[in-house]
Amino acid sequence: MKKNLISNHIQLNDSGKLIHLLGLEGLSKQHLTHILDKADSLIDTSGNLKKSKALDDMSIANLFFEPSTRTRNTFEIAAMRSSANVINVDLANSALKKNEDLLDTMRTLKAMQIDMFVIRHKQNGLPHHVAKYLEGVSILNAGDGINAHPTQALLDMLSIRQHKKTFENLSVAIVGDIIHSRVAHSGIQALKTLGTTDIRLIAPKILQYNSEPCSEVSCFDDIEPGLKDCDVVIVLRLQKERMIEANIPNEQEYFNNFGLTPKRLALTKSDAIVMHPGPINRGVEIDSIVADGNQSIILQQVTDGIAIRMAVMQILANKS
């Protein structure tokens, strides 16, 4: 896997409590479990999200430099359901278009009494850089390049825990564009921290890690043996925007070789769950019958994403 870009002391205060969420590397099982437990407490017995006044004295700014539907909207809803004031910064018409440095823009917003920034950016490590030089606010990484997507990994862990109860003895397959996926990078870290030892990465060799210690994960370039008796299947899309044109697979050929079809899903355990971080490309990485089937928990992941983001915001604000 790639080199860790997170200096963990930046994420934690002297008491070991989270003040930023930049990535999951170096965070303990206790840290992750605390977030999952907090998120669970924000979901009622009917599966509906509770409202909270926890952040009613706070202002949160969303800075999304990459397109997003699920992540941006769930962060906004999470902040609103926690009673925070939310600002979606109009980057297309901001001073950044006049070549203002991002840190200067954020310092200006901080002077407007912003307490927390949610950042998505194509540059690996940018939220870490901002957290290092911008004091007095919390930084929440909503995805940086191919490096990390901590809240997606956490919401995936929440969804898994709701169905499987424990992470030990699980077999988890991650299928798709592994090398370009920040979801895979953070998800593997979360699974290992929570005790999962059978993690299987399934992808064409060109989309697989160049190197990965065999003691940590198993790598497959054939989907069928990789899926055998799995408890959880996480499907990833082809991230064409991050690929060199010559390396972009033919979609039909990819589906024929690596698409999750009902026949292939039948190789997993009968109670296996199917997950996808979205957006879904039907007929490329997953068959619609599987995406909409009774083993799919894709829409539950979206709801769980709001709960996780509420939990993280409240924890960062020292409200939990």
From Swiss-Prot:
Organism of provenance: Vesicomyosocius okutanii subsp. Calyptogena okutanii (strain HA)
Tagged with keyword Transferase: yes
Alphabetical keyword list: Pyrimidine biosynthesis, Transferase
Gene behind this protein: pyrB
UniProt key word Metal-binding: no
Binding-site positions, carbamoyl phosphate: R70, T71, R120, H149, Q152, G278, P279
Entry-linked SUPFAM superfamilies: Aspartate/ornithine carbamoyltransferase
Protein name as it appears in the record: Aspartate carbamoyltransferase catalytic subunit
Enzyme Commission numbers on file: 2.1.3.2
Quaternary context: Heterododecamer (2C3:3R2) of six catalytic PyrB chains organized as two trimers (C3), and six regulatory PyrI chains organized as three dimers (R2).
GO biological process terms on file: 'de novo' pyrimidine nucleobase biosynthetic process; 'de novo' UMP biosynthetic process; amino acid metabolic process
Taxonomic lineage: Bacteria, Pseudomonadati, Pseudomonadota, Gammaproteobacteria, Candidatus Pseudothioglobaceae
Disulphide bond pairs: none
Known function: Catalyzes the condensation of carbamoyl phosphate and aspartate to form carbamoyl aspartate and inorganic phosphate, the committed step in the de novo pyrimidine nucleotide biosynthesis pathway.
InterPro entries: Asp/Orn_carbamoyltranf_P-bd, Asp/Orn_carbamoylTrfase, Asp/Orn_carbamoylTrfase_sf, Asp_carbamoyltransf, Asp_carbamoyltransf_Asp/Orn-bd
A cellular component annotation (GO) from this entry: cytosol
Family the entry assigns: Belongs to the aspartate/ornithine carbamoyltransferase superfamily. ATCase family.
Binding site for L-aspartate: K98, R182, R237
PANTHER family assigned: ASPARTATE CARBAMOYLTRANSFERASE (PTHR45753:SF6), ORNITHINE CARBAMOYLTRANSFERASE, MITOCHONDRIAL (PTHR45753)
Catalytic activity: carbamoyl phosphate + L-aspartate = N-carbamoyl-L-aspartate + phosphate + H(+)
